Design a protein with these regions (language model features):
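Flexible, polar/low-complexity N-terminal or interdomain linker segments that lie immediately upstream
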Residues: 1-35, 110-117
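Mobile, glycine- and charge-enriched loop segments
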Residues: 18, 25, 49-71, 109-114
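Short active-site oxyanion
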Residues: 21-27, 42-43, 90-91
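N-terminal-biased segments
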Residues: 29-49
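Short loop/helix-cap segments at secondary-structure boundaries that form the rim of catalytic
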Residues: 36-42, 56-59, 102
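Short, glycine/charged-enriched secondary-structure capping and boundary segments
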Residues: 40-44, 80-83, 107-110
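Short hydrophobic/aromatic-enriched beta-strand-loop microsegments
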Residues: 44-51, 90-94, 113
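Catalytic cysteine-centered active loop of the rhodanese-like fold, especially the PTP/DSP P-loop
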Residues: 58-103
C-alpha cells in the first residue's frame, strides 16, 4: 500500500518465490531481530530499516533487492527501499504483503539463528 504511494516497485510473495528460484536476490527483512528469529523468508537477512548503510547492501547497484516487513500496513520496508533507491540501487522492490502474506500463502519459511547473520 505505502510502497505504491511512494512510487516503489511491489512484488507479491509468489512472484518473489519464483524470482528466488531463477536468480540471485537479496531478501532483506526489516522486522525486529526477534521476528526474524521466529519466522522469515528463506535466505532473508535481517536489516535495520533506517540504520543501514551501503556496506550492508551488495556492491553491485544492479543487484535485485527485495525488502519486507510485517504486513501491508507496515512502512518500514517501503522506507528502507526508498533509501536504497536514493543510494543508487536500480532493482529495488517491496514485498508489501510482508511476512504475514508470505506465511498466509503457505510458502516455505526459516527460523532460528543462521550462520553469518
Amino acid at each position: 500500500m505505502f510502497a505504491r504511494l511512494m512510487g516503489l516497485n511491489v512484488m507479491s510473495p509468489g512472484k518473489l518465490q519464483q524470482l528466488m528460484q531463477k536468480q540471485p536476490v537479496s531478501v532483506l527483512d526489516v522486522n525486529s531481530r526477534q521476528s526474524w528469529l521466529t519466522v522469515r523468508v528463506p535466505g532473508a537477512r535481517p536489516l535495520d530499516a533506517m540504520g543501514y548503510d551501503e556496506s550492508d547492501l551488495p556492491a553491485d547497484r544492479d543487484s535485485t533487492l527485495v525488502f519486507y516487513c510485517s504486513n501491508f500496513m507496515c512502512r518500514k520496508a517501503p522506507n528502507a527501499a526508498r533509501r536504497a533507491k536514493d543510494m543508487g540501487y536500480r532493482n529495488v522492490y517491496v514485498m508489501s504483503a510482508g511476512i504475514s502474506g508470505w506465511v498466509g500463502a503457505s510458502l516455505p519459511t526459516e527460523s532460528g539463528e543462521k550462520r553469518g547473520a
